């Protein structure tokens, strides 16, 4: 792919005249953010980021951690790994001990009425956005209860491609300006994969928690067929969350059918609605 021939996306980009004190890359270790990191490392995207930050939920597939170990060695800028806690352990402990349940978008069934629903998604904020935000403030030298100075700006690069425009969202902090370089280069996910192939780079897998309810059936089927240990873990987790916790009384399920995961007959991909593209903001799955 000749990057010089690609057109800019223009109107979708934030127009700002701020000079950032820090440029950080939000690294998920999936296809898009890894492409972004390696393009920056090779000088295709400038200026060079000051660092990348990977927010570890503690429940990523083993392949993601293996790939991240490789990727770190290819980059001329540091990669900081940050972590709030292990999302699996936190959720299971909340069920076992009646503690507050860390909310993820699990599918629900009311025990009395049988009505189906979905919990609010708070996991991305708690286990991705906030740990990255905390690290940014640390890099700026700003304490937890301190205000970032008025004229201090941070530019945050996020790996969203042209086929995921619905996931674009502004930063929640006024001093952080989100930017999407893959959109500026008019690059889609397939082109990211082509870029890896042409350069012979190690290919990343999709970065998302093993237990993520936004997995489509194709992902669950692939996990069941090719990564049976991960699938068995997901099935075990699905059973453990079934009866919720102190603040959740409905029955909970990982699969949108609200059936036990090991009993679901997965549908072909063409029949599935992609929850990642339309709901989850660009911190997971990239």
Short names for language-model regions:
Residues 2-286:
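Nucleotide-activated chemistry modules centered on ATP-dependent adenylation/adenylyltransferase
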